[in-house]
């Protein structure tokens, strides 16, 4: 198996021209696409419909290209859209493809290479979102994805991206009508509960937390429990979790590798450099032009520190009634990463409940080997 990854700019939420160009020119085959991971220019909140709009645009395109229904497209390709391109972040999508190749002649000296596997959970009932059923279903799915990708060791997993559902007024009403409660009656807060439950599922699958320490009560409450490689993004456009596991495996060929580090806070540039160093792209204090030329994309989570401080300095992101704190945080983290890699077209998703330490989050880099 061999993974390929392509980063493509988007001029608007329905712009599939960059991907179409790659396919028309024979750079990639539509049949080999397994995931489209996008940053869309909406507000990243409950009523951000750019995520669904972009997903629909890609489903229509691939449906026509592959000659199958949109439903079938959705069953074979994970469309994970994260809304919010605040600050200098450039809207774009990252395309993951998997080619079936024979790596039997590969030597041990060639090392591990990027392995990717997409997988889907079942659809969740509204009363399950942000609670233990979502945790355990996500954990089971991540374990299956690791097996299918040939990733034997949890330490070889460097980034797990999840698109998860949220609660709307209608979904809450449905649960109540059937005699159930929901994790929260605030639609925006439900995004955090869903992200948090999904992240804890990843942590459980990778052995970062013990199941005995998990319950409905700890979700969005006990931030000492987290995954250092989880990246979860909630949206209105689905009711299941769509997951892509990224790691390194000797069973895969190609010239791509992935590494990660843990940002302690929103301005932790040292962690960004460490993630670059993890894939051989920052030998010295700062990456060189040649090293940056091998970087395919950077992926990170962003969050306004819940204690209201960054390095003992007060911040006001949580007190802004006009702009949600996740929007502030995305702009900050994107700027930090862009200042190091020299490119604002990187993937930064807001809301990092149980995704890295409180106020921080994981940062991962996919790059070509030297």
From Swiss-Prot:
Gene3D superfamilies: Cyanuric acid hydrolase/Barbituras, RU C (3.30.1330.160), Cyanuric acid hydrolase/Barbiturase, RU A (3.30.1330.170), Cyanuric acid hydrolase/Barbiturase, RU B (3.30.1330.180). Mg(2+) binds at residues 303, 352, 355-357, 360. Residues 256-370 are annotated as: RU C. GO terms for molecular function: cyanuric acid amidohydrolase activity; metal ion binding. Its EC number is 3.5.2.15. Keywords: Hydrolase, Magnesium, Metal-binding, Plasmid. The keyword Hydrolase applies. Pathway: Xenobiotic degradation; atrazine degradation; biuret from cyanurate: step 1/1. The active site is at residues 163, 233. It comes from the Bacteria. One of its GO terms (biological process) is atrazine catabolic process. Substrate binds at residues 51, 82-83, 195, 233-234, 330, 349-350. It catalyses: cyanurate + H2O = 1-carboxybiuret + H(+). Residues 113-250 are annotated as: RU B. It is an enzyme of class 3 (hydrolase). The record marks 326 as: Important for substrate specificity. Inhibited by barbituric acid. Residues 1-103 are annotated as: RU A. Belongs to the cyclic amide hydrolase (CyAH) family. Homotetramer. The monomer structure is formed from three repeating units (RUs) that share the same structure as one another. The monomer, the active site and substrate all possess threefold rotational symmetry, to the extent that the active site possesses three potential Ser-Lys catalytic dyads. It is possible that any or all of the three active-site serines may act as nucleophile (albeit only one can do so per catalytic cycle). Responsible for the hydrolysis of cyanuric acid, an intermediate formed during catabolism of s-triazine based compounds in herbicides such as atrazine and polymers such as melamine. Catalyzes the hydrolytic opening of the s-triazine ring of cyanuric acid (2,4,6-trihydroxy-s-triazine) to yield carbon dioxide and carboxybiuret, which spontaneously decarboxylates to biuret. This is Cyanuric acid amidohydrolase. It comes from Enterobacter cloacae. The lineage of its organism: Bacteria, Pseudomonadati, Pseudomonadota, Gammaproteobacteria, Enterobacterales.
């Amino acid at each position: 198996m061999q993974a390929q990854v392509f980063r493509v700019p988007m001029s608007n939420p329905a712009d599939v021209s960059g991907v179409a160009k790659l396919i028309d020119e024979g750079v990639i085959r539509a049949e080999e696409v397994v995931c489209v991971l996008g940053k869309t220019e909406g507000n990243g909140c409950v009523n951000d419909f750019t995520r669904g709009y972009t997903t629909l645009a890609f489903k229509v395109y691939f449906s026509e290209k592959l000659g199958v229904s949109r439903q079938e497209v959705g069953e074979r390709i994970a469309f994970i859209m994260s809304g919010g391109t605040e600050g200098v972040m450039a809207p774009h999508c990252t395309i993951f493809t998997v080619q079936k190749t024979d790596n039997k002649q590969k030597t041990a000296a060639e090392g591990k290479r990027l392995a990717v596997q997409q997988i889907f959970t079942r659809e969740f009932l509204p009363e399950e979102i942000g609670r233990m059923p979502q945790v355990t279903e996500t954990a089971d799915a991540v374990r299956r994805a690791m097996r299918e990708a040939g990733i034997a060791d949890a330490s070889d997993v460097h980034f797990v991206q999840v698109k998860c559902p949220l609660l709307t007024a209608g979904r809450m009403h449905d649960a109540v009508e059937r005699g159930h409660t929901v994790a929260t009656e605030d639609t925006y807060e439900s995004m955090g509960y869903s992200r948090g439950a999904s992240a804890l599922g990843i942590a459980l699958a990778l052995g970062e937390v013990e199941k005995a320490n998990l319950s409905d009560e700890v979700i969005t409450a006990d931030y000492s429990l987290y995954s250092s490689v989880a990246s979860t993004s909630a949206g209105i456009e689905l009711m299941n979790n769509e997951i892509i596991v990224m790691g390194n495996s000797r069973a895969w060929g190609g010239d791509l590798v992935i590494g990660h580090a843990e940002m302690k806070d929103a301005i932790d540039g040292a962690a960004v450099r460490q993630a670059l160093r993890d894939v051989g792209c920052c030998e010295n204090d700062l990456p060189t032009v040649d090293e940056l030329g091998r970087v395919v994309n950077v992926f990170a989570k962003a969050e306004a520190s819940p204690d209201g401080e960054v390095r003992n300095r007060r911040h006001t992101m949580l007190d802004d009634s006009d702009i949600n704190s996740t929007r502030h945080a995305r702009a900050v983290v994107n700027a930090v990463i862009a200042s190091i890699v020299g490119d604002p077209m990187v993937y930064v998703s807001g809301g990092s409940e149980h995704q890295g330490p409180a106020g921080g989050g994981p940062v991962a880099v996919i790059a070509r080997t030297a």
